[in-house]
A protein has these predicted regions:
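Transmembrane-helix motifs of polytopic, lipid-linked glycan transferases
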Residues: 246-267, 305
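Extracytoplasmic catalytic/substrate-binding loops of multi-pass membrane glycan-assembly enzymes
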Residues: 191-203, 211-227, 234-239
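Membrane-interface anchor segments at the N-terminal boundary of transmembrane helices
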Residues: 51-68, 239-243, 491-579
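Short acidic/glycine- and proline-prone juxtamembrane loop motifs at membrane-interface regions
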Residues: 288-299
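Membrane-proximal stem/loop segments at transmembrane-domain junctions that anchor or position
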Residues: 396-526
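Transmembrane-helix signature of polytopic, membrane-embedded enzymes
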Residues: 84-95, 173-175, 259-282, 301
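Specific aromatic-rich, kink-prone transmembrane helix
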Residues: 140, 208, 300-318, 335, ...
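Membrane-interface alpha helices of multi-pass inner-membrane proteins
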Residues: 327-342, 353, 382
């Protein structure tokens, strides 16, 4: 009885902490509360902190009271129960990360630093309490989700209606494909012949002006431009642009449909299949971004295929038959596409190849050597071809190397922030060495906390020795002020894990930016009204709660982290092989040049989310 009372008290304390955290995040502007005065004695300090509390508390309203009651009711009705075979740490560690990024993300969002946490004792205390509130709420939510998914894993599919059978069983590939096309057709019509972005046109300029380099993936540059040429031969460049849109949509929708085909094999509950279809059809970011002609869409399609193929490989690893020629060809093609359509795709392929080959050897290497060799061939061939393409073919064709600067965003941002904050400590020798690599004289002014592009574009090192000298200086400065370096990296990458950062309707307006180009791409004036309506529809859908979670980088990243933690805790580590491309994709985002609400960088993870619930349920059915 005493233990039950203690648990009840702890539960209500957790509920109160969660209420406080949410109320502060929704109402208080902590950036407007100045640091406390250093002098004045105890009573003056106490009065100052009470004044700061007044700044927070009066913002609460009857709506906040109603919301607080809902939180209290949630904690009262949802007990903290754990599946027997999932250790509690599997939810607690992701909850710690979620709370950490919510607290630190808030500070970086408003001050580009962690000053709102470490400004003074008052801010630190508020941050600790808010962190605790977010943590207990995240733990309760995560365990509720995992418990529900584990429960569904133990249930068998009930009988379904005629239309469900037709959609998900009889026509498991074509059915979802048709539904997605129906829902996406207004977006396709509104953006005809397709929306563009500056990088798209820059790729075509490289092709037509004969100055191709590997800043943009040459494979996509050539494919894009050849289809433009084909369209021109058939009548117009507008048609060529539309052919590019058709090709990338065909790749992406085929990947989605293959996911539904696999969910049929996995016997995924129909509820999760409908949810997956609903996410793809109704989340405006999916069709809005997919109708922009860009390298990210075919790249994302290949990554979705790769994740699904790896998932099926893990599921069927113990089958006696080796991989068929069709399976090997599929893996080779998607690996080539993943590495060919984005430069960082090579990292996804290499990690996936190592993970799949190593896992295959550990499970069937001695028992079924023939099947393991088929896995080895399926991944070794694309890796060899990719390396030959990048290291031999492209240089032989005169494709210029863009240099290492794309991979150096983290140290460059750390150096720029160091120069801005501790420029007086930089010696003349250090300044000279940095100046041989970056524009030292203007580095402090060029530094943008949320993107490395302004600094990165000043890279001009001519020799490897200059770069090595720079890294020596960078290491010295890192040791002198490590906190400054951590701040620089977090400031540039926190948004990938910050759940309050939403896409700002990126590429919302249909447009073709064709300045200084040799072709004409025309959007029909008759479709102007359709474009206007669909723009408003997309903006409306982006504001629908729950639906807009699936276009939130922080949400999808935390979902991936949660599944990884549960798989590890539940002894299902083999399924990390399936999501290894997504894990690497998130790491690439961290090392990349910017967050700045450009969700296309994390699209591979976002577009795989509809199938992760089905994959998780399938994994938890296995002994």
């Amino acid at each position: 009885m005493r233990k039950e009372n203690l648990n009840s008290v702890i539960n209500w304390i957790c509920a109160a902490l969660a209420c406080f955290a949410l109320m502060v995040s929704m109402n208080a502007d902590l950036s407007g509360i100045s640091a406390e005065a250093a002098g004045g004695g105890l009573w003056t300090l106490l009065a100052a902190n009470i004044k700061k509390l007044e700044y927070i508390l009066p913002t609460f309203s009857y709506r906040d009271a109603f919301f607080a009651l809902m939180i209290l009711f949630f904690f009262y009705k949802v007990p903290c129960r754990w599946p027997e075979y999932v250790p509690r740490l599997s939810c607690r560690i992701p909850a710690v990360l979620a709370a950490f990024f919510l607290v630190f993300g808030y500070s970086f969002r408003y001050t580009n630093s962690w000053d709102l946490i470490f400004m003074d004792s008052f801010h630190l205390l508020i941050s600790v309490v808010v962190f605790a509130g977010y943590y207990v709420l995240a733990v309760r939510l995560f365990q509720m989700v995992i418990r529900y998914l584990c429960k569904k894993a133990q249930e068998s599919n009930t009988s379904c209606g005629k239309w469900t059978t037709l959609l998900f069983e009889t026509h498991a590939f074509a059915g979802p494909l048709l539904v997605i096309m129906i829902f996406w057709s207004p977006y396709i019509l509104a953006k005809f012949p397709g929306a563009s972005m500056p990088e798209t046109l820059a790729e075509m300029r490289q092709f037509y002006w004969g100055t191709i380099n590997n800043y943009y993936p040459p494979l996509h540059t050539i494919m894009l431009s050849l289809l433009m040429q084909l369209g021109n031969l058939l009548g117009s460049y507008t048609l060529g642009f539309f052919l590019n849109l058709v090709l990338q949509l065909a790749m992406l929708l085929s990947a989605f449909s293959y996911g539904f085909l696999l969910m049929k094999r996995w016997k995924t509950p129909y509820l999760f299949r409908y949810l997956a279809l609903g996410i793809i059809c109704m989340t405006q970011f999916f069709p809005m971004e997919s109708t922009v002609v860009e390298k990210d869409i075919p790249y994302t399609a290949c990554v979705v295929f790769l994740v699904l193929l790896l998932a099926e490989l893990v599921r069927t690893i113990k089958d006696s038959e080796p991989l068929s020629k069709k399976q090997i060809a599929g893996l080779i093609l998607v690996c080539l596409g993943t590495a060919g359509f984005r430069n960082e795709g090579i990292y996804l392929v290499l990690v996936s190849a190592v993970a799949a080959i190593a896992y295959g050897w550990s499970v069937i290497g001695k028992e079924n050597l023939k099947k393991w060799k088929s896995i080895l061939v399926a991944f070794l061939i694309p890796v060899v071809l990719i390396l030959g393409y990048q290291k031999v073919l492209l240089p032989a064709c005169g494709v210029e190397d863009n240099g290492p600067k794309e991979a150096l965003s983290i140290p460059f941002q750390q150096t720029a922030r160091y120069v801005r904050d501790y420029g007086a400590e930089v010696t003349a020798e250090e300044a000279e060495i940095i100046g041989k690599v970056l524009d030292y004289e203007n580095l402090a002014e060029l530094y943008d906390p949320i993107t490395s592009d302004p600094v990165k574009y000043t890279y001009h090192a001519e020799t490897t020795g200059e770069l090595l000298d720079y890294f020596r200086v960078w290491a010295i400065q890192l040791v002198k002020h490590p906190a400054n370096a951590v701040e620089a990296t977090m400031n540039n990458a926190y948004g990938w894990f910050y759940q309050e950062g939403y896409t700002q309707n990126y590429m919302m307006t249909s447009r073709i930016d064709g300045q200084d180009v040799r072709w004409e791409i025309n959007q029909p004036a008759k479709l102007a009204g359709v474009r206007q309506v669909m723009e408003r529809v997309a903006k409306l859908l982006s504001r629908v709660p729950v639906l807009n979670w699936f276009e939130n980088a922080g949400m999808v990243s935390m979902l991936l982290i949660l599944l990884v933690a549960v798989w590890i805790g539940a002894g299902k580590k083999r399924y990390l092989v399936a999501v290894s491309p997504l894990i690497v994709a998130v790491l690439v985002c961290i090392a990349g040049p910017t967050f700045n609400y450009q969700m296309r960088y994390i699209m591979p993870v976002m577009f795989c989310v509809p199938f992760l619930a089905g994959l998780f349920v399938q994994s938890m059915r296995e002994l």
